[in-house]
UniProtKB/Swiss-Prot annotation:
Bilayer-spanning residue ranges: none
Assembly, per entry: Component of the 19S proteasome regulatory particle complex. The 26S proteasome consists of a 20S core particle (CP) and two 19S regulatory subunits (RP). The regulatory particle is made of a lid composed of 9 subunits, a base containing 6 ATPases and few additional components including PSMD4. Interacts with NUB1. Interacts with SQSTM1. Interacts with UBQLN4. Interacts with UBE3A. Interacts with UBQLN1 (via ubiquitin-like domain). Interacts with DDI2.
A Pfam family recorded for this sequence: VWA_2
Organism ancestry: Eukaryota, Metazoa, Chordata, Craniata, Vertebrata
GO cellular component: cytosol; nucleoplasm; proteasome accessory complex
Residues that bear Phosphothreonine: 250, 253
Protein name: 26S proteasome non-ATPase regulatory subunit 4
Known function: Component of the 26S proteasome, a multiprotein complex involved in the ATP-dependent degradation of ubiquitinated proteins. This complex plays a key role in the maintenance of protein homeostasis by removing misfolded or damaged proteins, which could impair cellular functions, and by removing proteins whose functions are no longer required. Therefore, the proteasome participates in numerous cellular processes, including cell cycle progression, apoptosis, or DNA damage repair.
Chain residue ranges for the region called Disordered: 224-257, 355-376
Length: 376
């Protein structure tokens, strides 16, 4: 594992307010710096990282330290202001690296450039030659203003590397949703000593390498399991509640249906008398009952009647039904029919009472017909 001290230079100019990187260039840069700091410290526990701003006075926010929490807390206090002074910032970072505690540490500067570099190319090349002599590697993340800066920064990095050198890198990132994702797959994190650290967050469960931080990975796994159990419990409760509501509504519906059915049965029972047991009646009683039903105008049919006969009755001529009804209301006609029926005694008390009622009904109907004709 490579022992290395790294100074991270962040761009905090007014250009960092732009939103071509979500949500802004400044916040996208913060996420990328977070990844860089963790990558360097995890690659070797003895590695140190420092933080410096490039705008205005090039302020050193933190000196070299293995404490990434301290670095990130300072990083989130950075606010956009002024313009960057690239060459000055690189010189200050180089000076900070000279004061590193581990003299056997290699020196590296990682610079984020998200605004136009106003230094001319000649000054950049001169600075690169000096850094190469001091064996300082520089990685540059060029984003936001790549059209303006790419040519200058390419000359700077090529001078650092020389003909055969590969220690310094220039990564140009076009506008997009994530600066950090582009940085993860870049040679800056996957280069010398950083092969393990070039893995993206999607390559590990919960974005954490279990071998690097087993306690954090375990805590995240337990937290996710608890969250899954809570969601399943909430889903079961919701299903039980909906089932309970459906269970309450269903008996209510059945009760209302039963009540409606009982009401209909009661109406049928009180609206007309039930059918008598014809098998227990004598022939005279059956004839008397038939005549009584005819007088009341109630149609009577047995449940065992043939369907074809009933359909024929439904489709019969209305005029014919009216004639049959008039004939059945004629007492003399009925008397003659009863006398000709075998086994029927016309002098039976039940038959005579029905015939008397029929005669009186016919008399009333005749009077009513006369009154209606007189009114006309």
């Amino acid at each position: 594992m490579v022992l290395e001290s790294t100074m991270v230079c962040v761009d905090n100019s007014e250009y960092m307010r732009n939103g071509d990187f979500l949500p802004t260039r400044l916040q996208a840069q913060q996420d990328a710096v977070n990844i860089v700091c963790h990558s360097k410290t995890r690659s070797n526990p003895e590695n140190n990282v420092g933080l410096i701003t490039l705008a205005n006075d090039c302020e050193v926010l933190t000196t070299l330290t293995p404490d990434t929490g301290r670095i990130l807390s300072k990083l989130h206090t950075v606010q956009p202001k002024g313009k960057i002074t690239f060459c000055t910032g690189i010189r200050v970072a180089h000076l900070a690296l000279k004061h590193r505690q581990g003299k056997n540490h290699k020196m590296r500067i990682i610079a984020f450039v998200g605004s136009p570099v106003e230094d001319n190319e000649k000054d950049l090349v001169k600075l690169a030659k000096r850094l190469k002599k001091e064996k300082v590697n520089v990685d540059i993340i060029n984003f936001g203003e790549e059209e303006v800066n790419t040519e200058k920064l390419t000359a700077f990095v090529n001078t650092l590397n020389g003909k055969d050198g590969t220690g310094s890198h220039l990564v140009t990132v076009p506008p997009g949703p994530s600066l950090a994702d582009a940085l993860i797959s870049s040679p800056i994190l996957a280069g010398e000593g950083g092969a393990m650290l070039g893995l993206g967050a999607s390559d590990f469960e919960f974005g954490v390498d279990p071998s690097a931080d087993p306690e954090l990975a375990l805590a995240l796994r337990v937290s996710m399991e608890e969250q899954r159990q809570r969601q399943e419990e909430e889903a079961r409760r919701a299903a039980a509640a909906s089932a309970a509501e459906a269970g309450i509504a269903t008996p209510g519906t059945e009760d209302s249906d039963d009540a409606l059915l009982k009401m209909t049965i009661n109406q049928q029972e009180f609206g007309r008398p039930g059918l008598p047991d014809l098998s227990s009646m004598t022939e005279e009683e059956q004839i008397a009952y038939a005549m009584q039903m005819s007088l009341q105008g109630t149609e009577f049919s047995q449940e065992s009647a043939d369907m074809d006969a009933s359909s024929a009755m439904d489709t019969s001529d209305p005029v014919k039904e009216e004639d049959d009804y008039d004939v059945m209301q004629d007492p003399e006609f009925l008397q003659s029919v009863l006398e000709n029926l075998p086994g029927v005694d016309p002098n039976n008390a039940a038959i005579r009472s029905v015939m008397g009622a029929l005669a009186s009904q016919a008399t009333k109907d005749g009077k009513n017909d006369k009154k209606e004709e007189e009114k006309k």
